[in-house]
Curated annotation (Swiss-Prot):
Residues 63-129 form the Sm domain. GO terms for cellular component: cytoplasm; cytosol; Gemini of Cajal bodies; nuclear body; nucleoplasm; SMN complex; SMN-Sm protein complex. GO terms for molecular function: RNA binding. Part of the core SMN complex that contains SMN1, GEMIN2/SIP1, DDX20/GEMIN3, GEMIN4, GEMIN5, GEMIN6, GEMIN7, GEMIN8 and STRAP/UNRIP. Part of the SMN-Sm complex that contains SMN1, GEMIN2/SIP1, DDX20/GEMIN3, GEMIN4, GEMIN5, GEMIN6, GEMIN7, GEMIN8, STRAP/UNRIP and the Sm proteins SNRPB, SNRPD1, SNRPD2, SNRPD3, SNRPE, SNRPF and SNRPG. Interacts with GEMIN6; the interaction is direct. Interacts with STRAP/UNRIP; the interaction is direct. Interacts with GEMIN8; the interaction is direct. Interacts with SNRPB, SNRPD2, SNRPD3 and SNRPE; the interaction is direct. The modification N-acetylmethionine is found at M1. InterPro entries: Sm (IPR047575), SMN_gemin7 (IPR020338), SUZ-C (IPR024642). Residues 1-31 form the SUZ-C domain. Its main location: nucleus. This is Gem-associated protein 7.
Length: 129
């Protein structure tokens, strides 16, 4: 007589933060700790240009991601290559923001119930709040 097959129980994975050397996960084996720099005001004069640029890029990325969040469920007009204009109900984007999932895509040749628009094909988009 055979014993019943048991289904293995999934084990949750804990992803540790990056170690002090920047490559490993977890903590340094010799007990080293990285020292955090104190927070500095936004308009500090001694900030290197790289950190100012990084802060500006972070602000622009946050605005872009907030605009994507605001578009969900609203009609959006897209301008594609070759001057093609389409309108659709925005649904979602993938993790890499490489594709937009839309519904009721109105194209010059008809309406598509659901579609994926590649961001590399989009020149601009607009929507009303």
């Amino acid at each position: 007589m055979q014993s019943p097959l048991t289904i293995p129980v999934p084990v949750p994975v804990l992803r540790l933060p990056r170690g002090p050397d920047g490559f490993s996960r977890g903590f340094a084996s010799d007990g080293r700790r990285t020292i955090l720099r104190p927070e500095v005001g936004e308009g500090h004069i001694q900030d290197p240009p790289e950190s100012q640029e990084q802060r500006a890029r972070a602000t622009l990325r946050e605005r872009y991601l907030r605009s994507l969040l605001a578009m969900v469920g609203h009609p959006v007009s897209f301008t594609l290559h070759e001057g093609v204009h389409v309108t659709a109900q925005f649904g979602a984007t993938d993790l890499d923001v490489a594709n937009f999932y839309v519904s009721q895509l109105q194209t010059p040749i008809g309406v598509q119930a659901e579609a994926l628009l590649r961001c590399s094909d989009i020149i601009s988009y607009s929507f009303k709040l």
